[in-house]
Amino acid sequence: MPNYKLTYFNMRGRAEIIRYIFAYLDIQYEDHRIEQADWPEIKSTLPFGKIPILEVDGLTLHQSLAIARYLTKNTDLAGNTEMEQCHVDAIVDTLDDFMSCFPWAEKKQDVKEQMFNELLTYNAPHLMQDLDTYLGGREWLIGNSVTWADFYWEICSTTLLVFKPDLLDNHPRLVTLRKKVQAIPAVANWIKRRPQTKL
């Protein structure tokens, strides 16, 4: 088994999907969390100046979704067929496109709040409806078993609900999917013991 070291801030953020995958696959790793004050010094040492990074036996991987695909490759989390794998990637990318619209690093609080409000008020409802329609009456987003797309939905929606608690009031099927992911023993155990952070 390779030695894994995950480096990210002390928050869920873009590293949480990697942590869920490690938990589900029962893979041991070092969860190295850095403070904002240490970031400038660390940033200058990274090939692309961004985290999370995953060190695998000393070799550095970057980009959270690329890391997630690397870890889930040849596992049931990736999807059971090539077509399912494409659908998994499409749902993950759809969610990530939306999450990337938010000005997470904006320093002007009034500008940040206005943009968040617009996205949550006008854009989020359309995405929730699209996801609800896509899920339909199925148990999971893709195929007949859980994939990392379901994990990513739970992670992204947890963050969105911090800012818009009524986000899923009209989408009980999406709420049920969240609860199903949270009830998976390995995921439930991780959620229970992880550091509690806002984001």
Curated annotation (Swiss-Prot):
Gene, per the UniProt record: HPGDS
One Gene Ontology term from the biological process aspect of the record: prostaglandin biosynthetic process
Function (record text): Bifunctional enzyme which catalyzes both the conversion of PGH2 to PGD2, a prostaglandin involved in smooth muscle contraction/relaxation and a potent inhibitor of platelet aggregation, and the conjugation of glutathione with a wide range of aryl halides and organic isothiocyanates. Also exhibits low glutathione-peroxidase activity towards cumene hydroperoxide.
Pfam families: GST_C_3, GST_N
Places the protein is found: Cytoplasm
Name used for this protein in its record: Hematopoietic prostaglandin D synthase
UniProt note on regulation of activity: Prostaglandin PGD2 synthesis is stimulated by calcium and magnesium ions. One calcium or magnesium ion is bound between the subunits of the homodimer. The interactions with the protein are for the most part mediated via water molecules. Magnesium increases the affinity for glutathione, while calcium has no effect on the affinity for glutathione.
InterPro entries: Glutathione-S-Trfase_C-like, Glutathione-S-Trfase_C_sf, Glutathione_S-Trfase_N, GST_C, GST_superfamily, Thioredoxin-like_sf
Consequence recorded when altering residue 97 to N: Reduces PGD2 synthesis by 99%. Loss of activation by calcium or magnesium ions
